[in-house]
Amino acid sequence: MREKGTGMKTQYGTCPIEECRSVKVTGTGIENDCCRIVSFEKKSEAQKIRAIREYFMEIGMQRVGAVDICLETDDDGKAADLTGLIVNALYQGAYRFSKTAVRRWEAGAAFARRDSLTDFGDLEIWIHGGVADAAGVDAANYVYTADVVDVDAVNCAETNPVNLPAVDIVIAAAIDCAVQFATCVGYARTLGNLPYNLLNIEEMVAYAQAISEKYGIRFHAYREAELKELGCNAILAVNQGSSEEAALVVMEYEPRPGEEKTALVGKGLMFDAGGYHLKSMKDMEGMQYDMCGAANLMEILEISAAGGLQKNLVGVFPLAANLIGPSASRMGDIIETLSGKTVEIYNTDAEGRLVLCDSLTMAQKLGTKCVIDLATLTYSCHAALGDLTAGLFCNDDALCKEIEDAMAQSGERCWRMPLDDCYRDEILWSAIADLANYAPGRPGAGPIAAAYLHEFIEDGTQWVHLDVVGPAVQRKSGKHLAKGATGVCMAGVCRFLAQE
């Protein structure tokens, strides 16, 4: 057994450690040496995927020891998918936020210390195909190990087709991509777990800039003066109570210049006290997580650039803090948004839709025709769908089906919510502005918030809105995840983007 503290390792081959846990994934379930642990009988494909994911998250939660995983399939595509699913599940379960790494904090530490802040424990993972032994393959002929140190250190594995069956070649090559992805999910969770005094607007801007410089992504952070000049008054209004300047971060990853671009718009409320509609102590708990939309999509940009995804992406991240101060926005204030539409601020704690409306307009001004936004937006969706399921709103049926399929194939849950005109009617009541940011006393706050955002989507633009107040945060440690940010929707959105 390896010494404790040497870090998580993932490798191709058969585990040489006698006391390792042996697990086999077959077409009918998950087995060990003596019995069936999980049965897939009468389960849909989505349920099978979730069962695999949850089982390996439980193993990951234990964080120590070794596990030998045998994938019994002769389907190359399924072998690659299973490798990615299992590795990510193990890392998700193993993840912890390192308390010791926050000592002597300094500017730029969120990026510089992210590997020490992101702790995956000491689990040792071995993965191979079920035909390896039958083919007489010696695992020593091919061993690829991915240590969690830096995503740049994880490159495409070289395979030897003479020594390995085809499925095992796929597994070996898939390991590095899986570790790269799982590591970036860990980074996103770490960003979400950092409190506002350590990860404020300035620190988040610096983090985005560091990623951009590392991978050659075009970067610009619009600050107060530029935001005023542009007319991003909704973002500015939310941040008026803060002593920091607001920011609108734009990151452009363009491997194919001139081709279509997809926008990733992530809500980045670094802390949300509610403004003058001040939250209670109970409701204010965990409000550092109100930037998980920005954190998760920013890390998807890193995954895409590090992995060489051949799809043009534009990240748009509004960064603000909704606090109380002499200049904070008041109930009844009217603002003119970047789109030119005016909005009456009825509820200062309905701030997410304000920063997002300017950001959605900016994304479209940058030439994107498909926009995906991710936001911890409404308690209504949380109440309706619970802790595990994202609310999905979409203005295009075919696109919605693609997102639903990508989420299901990644083991994540979402549920399509209505985007009907009756919800739009609820934001048109203002006598002094084009729109109101809230519908007082009306049920259906999730669809109403989505209807508000839909007002800023131009004709011909495909739009997906994911409301993730529930699944963005694990509110107490359970058998699958430690307490804190979860990296929700990263697997599903990445899978969608990887499709041709």
Where are these regions (language model features)?
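Short amphipathic alpha-helical segment within the helicase RecA-like ATPase core
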Residues: 2-261, 265-268
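A generic structural signal for tightly packed, nonpolar segments enriched in small/aliphatic residues
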Residues: 8-34, 66, 137, 151, ...
